From Swiss-Prot:
The lineage of its organism: Eukaryota, Fungi, Dikarya, Ascomycota, Pezizomycotina. It comes from Emericella nidulans (strain FGSC A4 / ATCC 38163 / CBS 112.46 / NRRL 194 / M139) (Aspergillus nidulans). This is Methylthioribose-1-phosphate isomerase. The keyword Cytoplasm applies. The record marks 173 as: Transition state stabilizer. Belongs to the eIF-2B alpha/beta/delta subunits family. MtnA subfamily. SUPFAM superfamilies: NagB/RpiA/CoA transferase-like. It catalyses: 5-(methylsulfanyl)-alpha-D-ribose 1-phosphate = 5-(methylsulfanyl)-D-ribulose 1-phosphate.
Length: 379
């Protein structure tokens, strides 16, 4: 059974609090767009597809409740203005992830078109927004399943020495059910390999400084009983150099893919791509079309979010009381007091280092001149 990180039914939204994982599996209710903004900003939910879905559904939940309590504005124009303002606020929570702004833009278009229809009421606007937001949830799961299947097929055909070999795959950060509406992107590829009986072993990086790999990806791999090993980020080069390990592919997710294929993803991705090229390992990006931003021409145009220094200088873990056996979460300092910290959340991997971009439409590869033509995916 695949982990369910987002629960939504009849206007009620709850998410698993990822800050508590892997020690406590606790769901929190999200009732308003402001609570959605806080959950995204505080990284209680993270992963580009997931934050877009949670943002949309948080506003859908708020509108659903306002509608039940008869507190919706009386005119279609007022409701439309309210939705636009709330969507703009939600986008500000994580600016690097294009899925969030893309979802907001699509929802705004749907609402604007309905508001311009003669005779549209305020409730009509609410209904069309809720329907569209709920549709995004279902579509993301469907798209992720296709991404997983496409990636598994590509690896089997292009990264394995023979048809009889099984894949050894390294992944970074968390790109599974916890980062999406379900199944996952890069981790979905690993799940599909496992389902096809073509996975030998998966490796996941710790993913400092927020430890999404050790806290979240490892949690999902254990949950799904996938054969896997956790390594620290600094062990990747040693892992790739071991003949007995024989890593066939590195598969990562993406927060934004520029028109030329440059990819912004969790900090450390660029370094893995460099290592992959040196060691002759296939390097793949797995992302839905909503992550591809054709308006951004190259990685140099991508805004990179910087996170608080405390995420580097402190770490959270569980402590068991020797007397009672009770487990509680504690945050401790691990760095010298007063040291300066640089903490970019993402880096940009040049398209030259990427062998393929896995989408729900298929796997985009470069032409003979070494260029991606991602616009063709939208034809």
């Amino acid at each position: 059974m695949v982990l369910e990180a987002i629960r939504y039914k009849d206007g009620k939204l709850s998410i698993i609090d990822q800050l508590q994982l892997p020690f406590t599996e606790r769901y929190i209710e999200i009732r308003t767009s402001e609570e959605g903004w806080q959950a995204i900003k505080n990284m209680q939910v993270r992963g580009a597809p997931a934050i877009a879905i949670v943002a949309a559904l948080s506003l859908a939940s708020e509108l659903h409740e306002l509608s039940i309590r008869n507190k919706i504005s009386t005119t279609a124009e007022d409701v439309t203005a309210f939705i636009r303002e709330r969507l703009g606020h939600l986008v500000s929570s994580r600016p690097t992830a294009v899925n969030l702004s893309d979802a907001a833009r699509k929802l705004e278009v749907i609402v604007s078109e309905r508001s311009q229809t003669p005779g549209s009421t305020a409730q009509d606007i609410v209904n069309v927004f809720i329907q569209a937001a709920e549709g995004m949830l279902a579509k993301d799961v469907e798209d992720n399943t296709r991404i997983g299947e496409n990636g598994a097929k590509w690896i089997s055909m292009n990264a394995l020495p023979t048809d009889h070999d099984k894949a050894v795959v390294l992944t970074h950060c968390n790109t599974g059910s916890l980062a999406t509406a379900g199944y996952g992107t890069a981790l979905g590829v690993i799940r599909s390999l496992m389902a096809n009986n073509t996975l030998q072993h998966a490796y996941c990086t710790e993913t400092r400084p927020y430890n999404q790999g050790s806290r979240l990806t490892a949690f999902e791999l254990v949950h799904d009983k996938i054969p896997a090993t956790l390594i620290t980020d600094s062990m990747a080069a040693a892992l790739l150099s071991r003949p007995e390990t024989r890593v066939n592919a590195i598969v990562v997710g993406a927060d934004r893919v520029a028109a030329n294929g440059d990819t912004a993803n969790k900090i450390g991705t660029y370094g893995l791509a460099v290592l992959a090229r040196y060691h002759g390992v296939k390097f793949l990006v797995a992302a839905p079309l909503t992550t591809i931003d054709l308006a951004t021409k190259s990685g140099g145009d991508i805004v990179i979010e910087e996170r608080p220094p405390s995420e580097v200088t402190r770490v959270k873990g569980s402590r068991e009381d020797d007397t009672t056996g009770d487990v509680r979460l504690e945050t401790i300092s691990i760095a010298a007091e007063g040291i300066n910290v640089w903490n970019p959340a993402f880096d940009v991997t040049p398209s030259e280092l990427i062998d393929g971009i896995i989408t729900e439409k298929g796997v985009a590869e470069k032409d003979t001149d070494g260029r991606f033509h991602l616009e063709e995916l939208f034809d």
